[in-house]
Amino acid sequence: IERIVALKPDVVLARPGHKVDERLESLGIKVLTLNAQTYEDMARELEVLATLLGRPGAGTRLWQQMHERMAVLRSEMPKQWQGKKVYFELHSGMAAAGEASFIGQTLHGLGLVNIAGRDLPMYPKLGPEYVVRANPDVIITMADMPVPPPKRQGWSSIAALRNQRYCRIPNAEFDALVRPGPRIDEAARRIVQCLRQLPLP
């Protein structure tokens, strides 16, 4: 707290649920809590931040630019990938990126169908039986995992693994895929790059 106060910031950006927020505000420091979970949240928070920094409209323009880049990326996707099923696994093992999450929105924007549909939470815990039954055409995870999908019992029958359609994103790059913010077009680009290197479905 003391170090933050010493810097005399105009505003502190924070995630919700931190007690430090109240302490900073009691010391007269403005705190902006950001908690984007969807594209709609990100668009709104970017403009709130831009307005706070004295640049109203800049957040909206940035969001539009990102969407334009996303449209270009989708056009670069081989048509064979359109409508194919994807399983996107997060850091925590069997936790998936659901369709309702911003990651799910990115996958949908690229024309992929998420096996963790809208009837599930944003980040559902999927059992191995669920994934095997859903039979995704492609699997996306970080590169270094304790037990990667190809080594999981019973997963060898999944179409993605039978056909070598498994995206292993380097851990250093995976962060851009799973954190909401102005890097969503970068995340989409990384997914497209990986898919273009895999055998076509």
Name each region found by the language model.
Residues 100-123, 143, 168-170:
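His/Asp/Glu-enriched short active-site or ligand-binding loop at hydrolase and phosphoryl-transfer sites
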Residues 57-113:
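Basic- and aromatic-lined ligand-binding clefts that recognize polyanionic substrates
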